[in-house]
Structure formats: structure tokens, C-alpha cells
Amino acid sequence: MHGRPSRPLASSSSSSSSRVFSFFLAPRVFLFLVVVVVVVFLPGRSSCWWLEGTEELEEEMGFAGDCSPVSGGGLSENGKFSYGYASAPGKRASMEDFYETRIDGVDGETIGLFGVFDGHGGARAAEYVKQHLFSNLIKHPKFISDIKSAIAETYNHTDSEFLKAESSHTRDAGSTASTAILVGDRLLVANVGDSRAVVCRGGDAIAVSRDHKPDQSDERQRIEDAGGFVMWAGTWRVGGVLAVSRAFGDKLLKQYVVADPEIKEEIVDSSLEFLILASDGLWDVVSNKEAVDMVRPIQDPEQAAKRLLQEAYQRGSADNITVVIVRFLEGTTTGGGPSREAASDQNS
């Protein structure tokens, strides 16, 4: 009676223990799986969000693995300018920023073509503009003789062609376009949306584009004159939907959200040091003056672009981040001191 329990009793005890074990373990296994799914597939966060605050961010660029920015650069054959770029999804799970850096020859003239394209509603519009805008521009019959007209017409033509290509899509997509065209000693900056162009001239940080926002008085008036409206929905939005007042695409709002670029021209002389083109992933957290001060001592434009990208990421930018820098080499000054904020700079 007091010997070893019979085998069935041992089996019964084991079965009872298993049931107790399962009772406590199963919910924990389920909870663990839920946590894994939530962490891995958490919407709105990049696959690299977990690097924040860890020692990996102390590396030279503050990124690791899939978080490393795409970067590169080059030098024009005539030696008059160099360029660099850096681009990364940042804290976003998807990438909707695109960029273009291109050196071409037209009628014996060396042409520099640089652009940043920040998509919304997906990447389709930004990718299309990257692939077609500059190709359309250099084929324009007035490209050399009347370059400003050529730029304006090409922006609108490319927008129209994209909208035709979008006819089968039910979801709207759009894109900003901040571009710089370098022809001889002329720098022409054309902008649609809220990507921004800033130059450093003689130490001054000067915005050479305007962020197109629907709460600007002239933009709001244009939208309302066209039959649209602007309302507050977290920020001022066209039709309560779109936070920029000009863009490529956005076919459902096209009557109000135009692709007419604002174009500014700068003369390339010894006082013009460099140009920064960037998406709002940079400008949301770094002022024009701060960006110029960071770039000015760095002669390699690729390293300068990576420096700005790193700074925006570490300051908590919630968006994709793309930076293109063009440094003008002929007769430029290369001071390393802090820049002066120009009076005309309204976007700092």
C-alpha cells in the first residue's frame, strides 16, 4: 500500500501536471507571439526603429544594417561643381522619397540636373517624376533658348502624362519636386510642394524656394477661386485631405493642387558656395541656417549630405529623409564659420 504507485497512477499524475503546465504556459506563449507580431509589423515604424538610443547610433553615421542611407556623389567633367546625396526611410516603414543627380550635355553645354521628389499616397508619383521630368526637360525645344518657359511647361507636361498613366489606379498618389538646373553660370531652382532648396551665398543661408502650403494667403485664394476649400485637420489641408497646395498627381484634387512651379534664378559666382535640396524629413527638424552651418565646413558633398541625414534622424524626424548637395568649385570661398541668416529666408 505504501510502495511505488502503479503505472496508471503515475500516468494520471503526469497528465495532470501537463494540464497544469499547459494552463499556465499557453496564455504566455500566445502573448509572446502577439508581442512578436506587433513589434515586427508595427505600422508606421521602420525596421530600424529599435536602434534608437542604442550604441549603434554612436557609429559614424548613426545607422546600421538596413538603416544605412543610400549615398553617393560625383564631379562634373568641367570641374565646376561636385555633388553628393544621401537618402533613407528614417522611422517610416515605407520609402516614398526619390532623388535624381544627373550630368548631361546639351548643345555642347554641360548641364547639371538635381532633384528631390517626396511622394504621398504611395511612391508611384515620385518615382514617375524622377524617371521622366529631366528627360522631358532636356528634350524641350526651348531648353537652352528660354529655359524658364521650358521648365514650367515640362513640369505641367510631366504632370499630365502621369495622370494619364494613373487612369487605372483608384488610389490617389502625388509628389513634390524640388529641382535645380545648372547651365553655365545660371542656377535655376524650380519647386512644387514642400521639399525645399537653400543656398549658401557668402555665408548667408538663403531659401530659394517656397514651401507650398494651403494656409498661405495667395495659395488659399487660388484654391478657393478654383472652387476648392482649405480646412484644419491636424494641419491646414486642401479639401481637408492634402497638406501641400501644389504637387504632381493627386488627380482627385487636380483642379486645386497644381503642378505650376515657382522658379528662381541665382548667378553662380565666387560668393555662391553650395546648394541644399531636401525633403521635409530634414526641414521639419533642421532650420535653413543650421543646415548651412553643418554643411559649410565639409568639402565632400556626399559626407555633408550624410551629416544632415544623420542629424535629422537623431533629432527625431518622423519622415523619410533625402538630401542632395551641390558644391560650386570655381572661385568659391570655403569659410568654416557660422552662416548669417539672410533676411529673405522665411523657412528657417
Curated annotation (Swiss-Prot):
Binds 2 magnesium or manganese ions per subunit. Mn(2+) 2 binds at residues 118, 280, 319. InterPro entries: PP2C (IPR015655), PP2C_BS (IPR000222), PPM-type-like_dom_sf (IPR036457), PPM-type_phosphatase-like_dom (IPR001932). Its EC number is 3.1.3.16. The chain crosses the membrane at residues 23-43. Keywords: Hydrolase, Magnesium, Manganese, Membrane, Metal-binding, Protein phosphatase, Transmembrane, Transmembrane helix. The keyword Hydrolase applies. It is found in: Membrane. GO terms for molecular function: metal ion binding; protein serine/threonine phosphatase activity. It catalyses: O-phospho-L-seryl-[protein] + H2O = L-seryl-[protein] + phosphate; O-phospho-L-threonyl-[protein] + H2O = L-threonyl-[protein] + phosphate. The keyword tRNA-binding does not apply. GO terms for biological process: regulation of intracellular signal transduction. It comes from the Eukaryota. It is a single-pass membrane protein. Residues 82-328 form the PPM-type phosphatase domain. Mn(2+) 1 binds at residues 118-119. This is Probable protein phosphatase 2C 10. It comes from Oryza sativa subsp. japonica.
